[in-house]
Amino acid sequence: MALTKKQRAELRMKFGGRCAYCGCELPEKGWHADHVQPVARIHEQDMKAAEKGIFKLKATGGVRNIYADTLENQYPACAPCNLFKTSYSLEMFRKQISLQVERGRKSSVNFRTAERFGLVEIVAKPVVFWFEKYQAEGANQLPS
C-alpha cells in the first residue's frame, strides 16, 4: 500500500521520530515503512536476464499476505534495520540479532582481534526493541 505524505509523516513520529527497532533518529527522508507482519512480496524470474544466463528475480508488485498490507501493520524503521529484518517475524528478527555476536566472533578476524585487546566487550542481555521501551516507559520518559 502506498502511503500519503501525511500518513508517512505520522508513521515516522509513531515512536518519537525514531526507528521502531534500534531507536536511532529517523531523517526526514531515507527511512522505511516496515511491515511488522511481513507481506511476502511475490517475485518471478526475470526472463531477459535468463536469456543472458543470469538468474534474477523481480518483484511483480503482488503480495502473498494482503491482510498484512495495512497502515496499522507498519512501523517506521531505519534502512539498515528494515533490510536486515527482511521478512522475519518480530521474534525471528530478535533471534537473528541475538546471533550477531557469535557470528562476528566466528567469521571476523577483526572482531576477534578487537575482543582480544579489550576493545569489544560482549554483554549477554535480551534484545529489546525501541518500540517496546517506548510503549513501556511512555513517550515522555525517553530521550528525544
What is each stretch, according to the model?
Residues 1-10, 14, 24-27, 47-75, ...:
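Extended charged
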Residues 18, 32, 77:
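The −1 position to Zn-ligating cysteines in a subset of zinc-ribbon hairpins
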Residues 32-38:
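Histidine-centered catalytic micro-motifs used for acid/base chemistry in nuclease
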Residues 42-45:
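Compact nucleic-acid interaction/catalytic patches
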